[in-house]
Each structure stands twice: as structure tokens, then as C-alpha cells.
């Protein structure tokens, strides 16, 4: 849902930008440089420049990462991403983005429980030998976990705790495997999906 909103907002911004360009062209043609500078200043204050980053060949994954990674960076979280995807996968874009979105959202929340200098997320999404899709993620956190048997539970006060369950269900839909684990300072997610 957030990804769709991001794409709609981007399309609307591009459409509106045409009007901005026409206004700038008219002010420039009239050589009204004072008004031109004021207009540009207002525009830049209202719409900070966010450069689109292309992490991989998959447009849906790029849209998701361009939505989530700036939030991580604004929170002083160091991110190390390696995303190498083929042109097509048997995993739908919706399911892939659901998995990655839940992983990253949980990782960002986990990082927020430690001091800024210790915040780190590593995410690798690759295929091996054209037989498996591997998603490996790790993030720092405060080491506090809640479990019911081997099932991780949310530690957030108002959290719903369905992110990891959603990942598990989605991966199993493709006959894949998921393993979540942790040590005193890091949380790990290891996913393998046959392709």
C-alpha cells in the first residue's frame, strides 16, 4: 500500500512539474530574475530534492527501497545493500516487496533501539546458479527479544507483530525456507526461495 502511494505521488509530482517548468520559462523570458529566484527558493523548500536511486533491475523493488532507505538514512542508520535480481522471477513483485518491506521495516525499528553510531542494516538479495533466490538481512538492535516457543513476538508497545509471520507465510507460498535468529546485538533473517 505504501509503495502504491509512493508511485502515485511520484506520478502526480511529475505531472505538476510541467506547470512549474512553464512558469519558470515565462519568468525567464520576461527576465524577471527576482521572481524567478523567489519561485525556485519556494519550490526547493516545498519539495526537497530526493534523487531516485536504482538499486536493481526491478522497478517495484526500486520504488520500495526509494521509499524506505531515506527513512533509514534520516535516522542515522548505515545501510549496506546488495540487490542483484534477474529480469524475471517466479515470485510476484507484490510478494517480493512484501517480504523486503517487512524485513526493512523491522530492521529500521530494531536499529532505533540502539545509539546512532551502532545503527546498521545489511541486506543482500541475490540468486545463485539460477536455482534459488537468497535474501539475507541483518541489523543491529538492543538484544531484547520476546518469544513464544520459537516464534518471535513484537517488542514494540503498540506493534501488531505480524511482519515476521507475513514473511514466513509468503516465503512458504513459494516452497521456500525462512530462518530468524539473533545474538546479543544483531537480528538475522535468512530466506531461500527456489526459482
Over which residues does each language-model region extend?
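Glycine-rich nucleotide-binding loop
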Residues: 143, 183-190
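Short beta-strand/loop element within the Bergerat-fold HATPase_c
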Residues: 118-131
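Glycine-rich/acidic phosphate-handling loop/turn and adjacent ATP-lid/helix
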Residues: 130-161
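Short beta-to-alpha transition helix within the HATPase_c
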Residues: 38-45, 57-75
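Conserved ATP-binding N-box helix of the HATPase_c
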Residues: 93-117
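Conserved short strand/loop->alpha-helix "switch" segment adjacent to the catalytic nucleotide/phosphoryl-transfer site
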Residues: 53, 57, 79-100
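Glycine-rich ATP-binding loops of the HATPase_c
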Residues: 175-185
